[in-house]
Amino acid sequence: MYIPGPLRLSSYLLPFLSSPSPPAQSSPDTRTISFKPVHAHGHAFVDNASTPTLLFLDQSPSASLYAHDYPIGAFGDDYMLPRLTSDVLEIRTRKKLIRRPKVRPPRIISWAQSYRAQALHFNGINNNNDNSNKSISLPESWLAPDLANPSDEWSDVEVTVPDLTDRQTVITLAKMSSNAYVTPGGAGWYTLNDWNASMPFGWEPDADGLRGHVFADEKNETVIISIKGTSAGVLGSGGPTAKNDKFNDNLLFSCCCARVDFSWTPVCDCYAGGYKCGQTCLEDALVSESVYATVGTNLYNNITYMYPNATIWLTGHSLGGAVSSLIGLSFGAPAVTYESPGELLPASRLHLPLPPGMPANLSGITHVYHTADPIAMGVCNGPYSSCYAAGFAMESKCHTGETILYDTVRVKGWSVDVRTHRIEEVIDKVLADPWPEEEEGKSGVWEKAVEGWYRAADRVRAALDESVVRDDVNVWWGWGRRGPKRQPGGEDPKHGGVPKPVSEEDCVDCYKWEFGEWN
């Protein structure tokens, strides 16, 4: 909240003019912060290496900090670093409780490792003779806390998070997510004055792995990691990360290794015929180092090492949003995603903390998306969908944490179209307008949208398939800039106008499939 100068001055004079009172808190519940550039961050797979290499680069190469032994020349010259000036963009913050384990896990896969270790111990299985643990090595010390006893092994910690009731904050984070797609200094950047466009990780010419940027405020008290989404086929213009993007989309968001039908090549060997799939096999595949969720562990750990006293946030669009959410769930970090596919499916396979032990409002995860996006809504599947045609098995629809759902189909009259998935469309045509508040006495539109997920998804999928069958998708283009109507004489408020977050409590993925041990 912005406090004018006279009010700030009065806060110093009041103690002398009034009777003593209990001391106030050191910081207000809501405040606004801004950022400036400081670093660059690179990530790549070097020759004959099974794990990715990370490096951090300051504005001056002489001040570079290496996370691993990696030649600085491979990143590029100083001209690749962002030089951002222009409009001031700010983020409003507030305090929020987030549930975290008292002992922090070393990695994302530590949750799966701990689950496997406890299962083996409970069943009396000797790990040395068990062939099901080739990919998941068991942890030496860390054990996942019991969600049934939150008071003993968990802490509800008050942390600073982005205030997502503030529309400008939602827009600023979305622009950071958009910037994760673009090479620093290249076309498409949103200029962020007083924000730190730092560490553009993964932008080496031959890098095909995790990409994005890191932002930090002037005091290094808040650091934001933005992660790039998919850059291939139906979702973008391609690029060096296209192959890895598609592989990870199909591994994370498909029911069983992207084995959609006989014509598809699976991304793992877990299919057991019919609608059966190997559960342990899927879990092993998800902890592979080629998966962005595990690569993100190295990124998060290095950022926390560089900024040990900072609050770390994550944000991203599409695949980048899902990866941000998985990292946030693993380490108890706030994450805001945009148009993310449903990532409850991979989160459950990684045994990350989920309800009922982890309440949605204490997870720190918030998903922002709209009802005309078939990918985020989980309906971009089936033989007539654009995702199927491009080779993407986007079969999941359920999200962790809380959801801010923009009902663009009802309010704006949009039709379901994969092109509305692009982050630029979301920023310019969804977030730019203040959203209408719910009329008093009426039940929540967002609660209804989530509670009736199956019915809504089936209707949207049928409409999407029908549009392609008619071959009139170019005519079926109902998502122009038509926003909520303003009151006569009213102004466009900069803040507010954001739907209320709700949890997707009744959502179920892959209901046709049966998961178990079929070997």
UniProtKB/Swiss-Prot annotation:
- Positions annotated with a glycan in the UniProt record: N48, N133, N196, N220, N302, N309, N361
Q: Where is region (Disordered) located?
A: 481-502
Q: Does the keyword Transferase apply?
A: no
Q: Which SUPFAM superfamilies match?
A: alpha/beta-Hydrolases
- For this protein, the parts annotated as crossing the membrane are 6-26
Question: Which Enzyme Commission numbers does its entry carry?
Answer: 3.1.1.3
According to UniProt, the reaction catalysed is: a triacylglycerol + H2O = a diacylglycerol + a fatty acid + H(+)
> Where does it sit, as one GO cellular component term?
endoplasmic reticulum
* Family annotation (CDD domains): Lipase_3 (cd00519)
Q: Could you give a GO molecular-function term held by this entry?
A: triacylglycerol lipase activity
Q: Which UniProt keywords apply?
A: Autophagy, Endosome, Glycoprotein, Hydrolase, Lipid degradation, Lipid metabolism, Membrane, Signal-anchor, Transmembrane, Transmembrane helix
> Biological process (GO) annotations?
multivesicular body membrane disassembly; neutral lipid catabolic process; pexophagy; phosphatidylserine catabolic process; piecemeal microautophagy of the nucleus; vacuolar protein processing
EC class, as a word, reads: hydrolase
Coiled coil feature spans: none
Concerning InterPro entries, the annotation shows:
AB_hydrolase_fold (IPR029058), ATG15_Lipase (IPR050805), Fungal_lipase-type (IPR002921)
Q: Could you tell me where this protein is found in the cell?
A: Endosome, Multivesicular body membrane; Prevacuolar compartment membrane
What domain of life is recorded for the organism?
A: Eukaryota
Q: Which residues form the active site?
A: S318 (charge relay system)
Task: Identify the main location.
Answer: membrane
Membrane topology note: Single-pass type II membrane protein
List residues in topological domain: Cytoplasmic: 1-5
Role this protein plays: Lipase which is essential for lysis of subvacuolar cytoplasm to vacuole targeted bodies and intravacuolar autophagic bodies. Involved in the lysis of intravacuolar multivesicular body (MVB) vesicles. The intravacuolar membrane disintegration by ATG15 is critical to life span extension.
Describe the protein's quaternary organization and the partners it interacts with: Binds to both phosphatidylinositol (PI) and phosphatidylinositol 3,5-bisphosphate (PIP2).
Q: Say which family it is in.
A: Belongs to the AB hydrolase superfamily. Lipase family.
Designated name of the protein? Putative lipase ATG15
